[in-house]
From Swiss-Prot:
Domain VHS: 33-169
Subcellular location: Golgi apparatus, trans-Golgi network
Stretches the record annotates as Disordered: 358-378
PROSITE patterns: GAE, GAT, VHS
GO (cellular component) term, any one: cytosol
Origin species: Saccharomyces cerevisiae (strain ATCC 204508 / S288c) (Baker's yeast)
Name of protein: ADP-ribosylation factor-binding protein GGA2
Function: May play a role in the regulation of membrane traffic through the trans-Golgi network.
Compositionally biased region (Low complexity): 365-374
Amino acid sequence: MSHPHSHSIYLSELPVRKPQALGNPLLRKIQRACRMSLAEPDLALNLDIADYINEKQGAAPRDAAIALAKLINNRESHVAIFALSLLDVLVKNCGYPFHLQISRKEFLNELVKRFPGHPPLRYSKIQRLILTAIEEWYQTICKHSSYKNDMGYIRDMHRLLKYKGYAFPKISESDLAVLKPSNQLKTASEIQKEQEIAQAAKLEELIRRGKPEDLREANKLMKIMAGFKEDNAVQAKQAISSELNKLKRKADLLNEMLESPDSQNWDNETTQELHSALKVAQPKFQKIIEEEQEDDALVQDLLKFNDTVNQLLEKFNLLKNGDSNAASQIHPSHVSAPLQQSSGALTNEINLIDFNDLDEAPSQGNNNTNGTGTPAAAETSVNDLLGDLTDLSISNPSTANQASFGLGGDIVLGSSQPAPPVTTTNNSNNTLDLLGLSTPQSPTNSQAVNSSGFDLLMGFNPTTGTTTAPARTLVNQSPNLKIEFEISRESNSVIRIKSFFTNLSSSPISNLVFLLAVPKSMSLKLQPQSSNFMIGNAKDGISQEGTIENAPANPSKALKVKWKVNYSVNSTQAEETAVFTLPNV
């Protein structure tokens, strides 16, 4: 007897949808972790799924959250319980990228989809587990995390359920401690890695959502992630400085307590905690010194602080062993003077923002490659292209397969609608847009608009007719993907570009998003892509048309555009980017 899911996958010429669970390794793992045949939750498999999500990133946290929300509403209670168990593991092990997904309005609406408008006399086990989960999130990531502003909808759902009469269980301190942030000293590289992961997840959600204020925020974030501003490094250094100051205050407090006439002062809970904090942090000192060796002031300060910590640890151990005479000969110096801090232009400019209603769309990856020429020339040309990044709009691919997600329950935070199309107007203060993905424009919105600069994937209404026969030009070719442009001139000021994408690998390419940018003196308008998925070895499997306005026919210098493409192949996120010089047309 054949398995009900053991059918082949047929790719028709109908509009392409996202690959089904059968072809997605993550969704297969989730289905296996929630299967009815399990006697109890499979913790090893659940942790394996968490590791998989942390490794893959990209769309993985989002795909997992959507799949789990649906499984939690399964009519089989065993499946729902296993899904909630897996959800708990992912929340506690996958960090901000997954927290961002559970804070979405649609996810929360789907989570409580089976809750009646008024509380039942007795909660079901599923309802109790869901209320417990929301209470845990409310008491931890909504209050104590560094990105708590992004968790607004969790707070709203907690407040709404309470208003409806639902009672939340009391959560033990030990359970809450797992999700509360730990104030451990980290090196700059560790901090920057965490920042990059969080920023990549935030950027995907900003792009997918497509509201003007979010896209402006995405522009700022893209600028930082692309390395045009060094705020990640600045913030990492400030975080180190802040944690060191806290440790120094702890060191001084421990020193005062060990100097106390009370001979048993070393053995109380506070002293033990201070001793533990210093002992755990000390191995990081050497790593920070290695990474920050060019900062002589920081290195010297750390070396001095390390000597003080060694003295304190030795004094603590002597008192613990009853050798108070030897301990009295050790007098560590006072160390809690604040370190000198650096400051950056955008130190406080980028915060993880409060997301409102979100709608479904694919995500991008966050690996970086650069195809520019010499570093100096590339930096000059790219900075000329980029400048400040402002108004843009976004386009969401078809989401028919998620149409009912987050809808239909008695308790909802509000209707979720796709972001409306956004048009940009010329503004002398705006310099350029990096990263605009457009919502398809309605037929009535036919007025031509000029962007102030650099739009990636701006929606537009097709203009009619071309005056020059298009010639195809190779833009880039990698082992997986070939990109070509057909470039023609419509008028003395308008260039038409049609992009073609060919899959050079035998594996399907999915979640492809192409971003394009032009100098700030010009305006870019792009139609939505023909698709975001193509089968292996598909020639011209995806195409996209667009126009560049305010492009003079005989420019004084060659027109350069910056392009970037994100896609998934073999369950791996890929990104390619470069600056391309258009041939004169």
